[in-house]
UniProtKB/Swiss-Prot annotation:
HAMAP family in UniProt: PsiMP_glycosidase (MF_01876)
Active-site residues from the entry: 24 (proton donor), 158 (nucleophile)
UniProtKB keywords: Glycosidase, Hydrolase, Lyase, Manganese, Metal-binding
Residues annotated to bind substrate: 85, 105, 139-141
Cofactor note: Binds 1 Mn(2+) ion per subunit.
Cofactor: Mn(2+)
Disulfide bonding pattern of the chain: none
Chain coiled-coil ranges: none
The protein's Enzyme Commission number: 4.2.1.70
List of residues binding Mn(2+): 137
Protein function: Catalyzes the reversible cleavage of pseudouridine 5'-phosphate (PsiMP) to ribose 5-phosphate and uracil. Functions biologically in the cleavage direction, as part of a pseudouridine degradation pathway.
Protein name stated in the entry: Pseudouridine-5'-phosphate glycosidase
Length: 303
């Protein structure tokens, strides 16, 4: 039997049949600077609770897989400098080596499914990197979506990626991407990508119904619920694209590769947008947590 350490709040939720929403920990250790990372982690948990669900931030601590963190553990991840960034492939190593590890989308999905959590809120999924024809840099998040039965509530894929190619790979893996109040794929910082989805839901009940039906007939894959960033914080697509171009040039000049690419680009985006990207990231994370809680509650009520 897989050993998971459930926080008391999460244990109680399972025992009482309450809805639970998974949250990742990479945003704490690798996504945002301190103390902003700690504040957003606590805010996301508060948002999930306010929406009627129980938050379960997932991480590996000294080789033990935790589903739900204390405030002290969140503080540790916000300040520690030796935290591994974990995809699915890295979980076993971190456990065996007794290391601390922050979970990416892929690792969070894998552990959430083991724990029996159906809904997961994050900022944006990984995908096919620009220039992947040369580098073969494709996020493990996409493969995980193809095999883990978890609903991922996000603002689409991160806009630093090749969004059309990312959609193609998700289609290949049998992963539906459903727009929430939109028929267009959000581009993380921007509401518009120009990529039509052809699948739309307009409220938590519809989203829960779509997910429940996919669970029955989708062959075990996950689903992406793509939520546009809040209108008041969404950035102009042309402004974002120009900043991305400069950030990618910096990454190439610095020889950044592999798992370090996304954190580097997000940090460069913050500099290039003079902090606007961080404000948008924070707003969409909170918005996604709110939607995820509402969908989790709707799922619970439909049972």
């Amino acid at each position: 039997m897989t050993k998971l350490i459930l926080a008391p709040e999460v244990q109680a939720a399972f025992a009482n049949g309450q809805p639970v929403v998974a949250l990742e920990s990479t945003v704490i250790s690798h996504g945002l600077p301190y103390p902003h990372n700690r504040e957003i982690a606590l805010q996301l948990e508060a948002t999930v609770r306010a929406g009627g669900a129980v938050p379960a931030t997932i991480a590996v601590i000294q080789g033990q897989v935790h589903v739900g963190l204390t405030n002290e553990q969140i503080e540790h991840f916000a300040t520690a400098t030796d935290v591994l960034k974990l995809s699915r492939r890295d979980i076993g190593y971190a456990v065996a080596a007794g290391r601390d590890g922050a979970t990416t989308v892929a690792a969070t999905m894998a552990i959430a499914e083991l724990a029996g959590i159906q809904v997961f809120a994050t900022g944006g999924i990984g995908g096919v990197h620009r220039g992947a024809r040369d580098t073969w840099d494709v996020s493990a998040d996409l493969g995980e979506l193809g095999k883990s039965s978890v609903l991922v509530v996000c603002a689409g894929a991160k806009s630093i990626l090749d969004l059309p190619a990312t959609l193609e790979v998700l289609e290949t893996y049998g992963v539906p991407v459903v727009g929430y109040t939109t028929e267009e794929l959000p581009a993380f910082y921007s509401a518009h990508s120009g990529l039509q989805l052809g699948r739309r839901v307009d409220d938590p009940t519809q989203a829960a119904a779509a997910w429940a039906a996919h669970r029955l007939y989708g062959g075990g894959s996950g689903m992406v619920l793509a939520v546009p960033p809040p209108v008041e914080k969404a950035l102009d697509p042309q402004f974002v694209e120009a900043a991305i171009g400069r950030a990618i040039a910096q990454a190439e000049a610095a020889g950044i590769r592999g798992a370090a690419v996304t954190p580097f680009l997000l940090s460069a985006m913050a500099r290039e947008t003079e902090g606007e990207s961080i404000a948008t990231n924070t707003a969409l994370l909170n918005n996604n947590a709110q939607v995820a809680a509402q969908v989790a509650v709707a799922l619970f009520q439909s049972v």
